[in-house]
């Protein structure tokens, strides 16, 4: 997606965020965050106490109450600012998407007039894209902007999707395959396609993207809800504790005959400093930023729930082709069966591949031409009928002169031959095993009931993929390779790539069964898919990343869409989810650890007049009780601002196991949360004493 990269504190983001910070002071917005709502109420109470002090009836000096009041309001505003800044980044992304929506016209045709070729195209009616409805059909030719999301039902065209994906390389969109989905706002570069509209106005992919990224009423994720409950429970505990301090203070003064009861302003300051305001103020920003980071990676998540689930994933199902291997298998050798010459095998293999537009099919045609000078033939001129590949048959080929010529997986061809009453030779099975053990893919070719031999397809594992899988393994994530190859080929590639397990000769039903098996054992499963046959498994998976180049059914079944249509992106999705959970956990640890230092600052200051012995707890040697309280309140507010970059950017991602992550978290953010307030409060106290 083409967009200018904004800095974290870019003026375009900061100015609206400041305005939104004040707009969010509305009680209807504040009560959604229970912890910060307590600070909000405390700010109102101290404001009333300050107004009272102006008339000479205050419990403390008006300047002290004013200082506490202002910094309590700043605490609320800083939390609002963190959330508004995160939302602002999403809104900026939505604005760039909205810029893609331009006035577009469509060449609408009647359903009965779908052309088989461009020369026979019917007359079309020029209508505005806003008039198109689900089920309508339009034609798009070179230089036309595709008017709406839809499925290609005829033709093939080169399409520029850079407006959506940011990738300048054009993509091919054609009918009848897994690359039939087109997106409104993209442009046809060459040839023509007939498109059936799959959405109504306002429901397009871009509309849904805009809605997802700028939706202010973001649904809380389960972990976020659980953490909120914990924070509310802590707040209630501290509220009860602070509420008991007033009668305790009054009793202590009466019993000791010295000092004065604790002031309401001090109690409010103590409560605000003790409750977990840091994480409460940043919690929403962390969630929004997580979705924003996904979008920066060109992945659109339907909800924060999907991003969070990615962080909890235990099992990754990865398609071999395009994810683990480069996906451009090339024919490299012909292994003829007994009684068949290599040239005869090449001839039949080429016939089976004439109408096969896959890279593998085209490479077979080219290899036959290079090795034996077998020229390509026009499939219609030789009276052949193409039989396309399906996930169920796992074969393709042609029917010609009453004979079935097929190529496909060994098990599929064996089943096909035996169904026709033929015999599958043992030497061919041995050739299949030999090819598989080399890590190549064997395609068996047959003519009628006769097995002609094996075509060897070489596959190349992506560089660095083994190291990525090792990182995932350290994090406790199990990787499973999904492939249609036979078990020997799958085992060879799985060993080379370093995956934990593999599923060979996989059908859509096998994928679905595997997902359900792992889920029944309490694991979360992530997978990618692009075809209609992937839709059931995508719908079942906890994290389902659909390819933007895939079918409409796949995109509707998934809870994320990868605009780059890169299956390897699933690993990045999981890492981003992990980073969001790590950030939330780290800042929660830091926030709770903060309370210890604030306790040493405020408790002695609040009761030292009554109990001078408490001066021993003033380990920071703060200059005065009022300065100590004010310093703690100021630090409590400023730490939110200082942690905003960490909340938005996320903590540094490390591929570690749960125990190692916990140790790292406690060392950096637990110990850091203990030490930082002692230093910060002391520095602020020194500044106040100078002023």
Swiss-Prot record:
It comes from the Bacteria. Mg(2+) binds at residues 530, 534. It is found in: Cell inner membrane. PROSITE patterns: ATPASE_E1_E2. Gene3D superfamilies: Calcium-transporting ATPase, cytoplasmic domain N, Calcium-transporting ATPase, cytoplasmic transduction domain A, HAD superfamily/HAD-like. It is a multi-pass membrane protein. One of its GO terms (molecular function) is P-type potassium transmembrane transporter activity. ATP binds at residues 356, 360, 389-396, 407. Its main location: membrane. The keyword Nucleotidyltransferase does not apply. Part of the high-affinity ATP-driven potassium transport (or Kdp) system, which catalyzes the hydrolysis of ATP coupled with the electrogenic transport of potassium into the cytoplasm. This subunit is responsible for energy coupling to the transport system and for the release of the potassium ions to the cytoplasm. The system is composed of three essential subunits: KdpA, KdpB and KdpC. This is Potassium-transporting ATPase ATP-binding subunit.
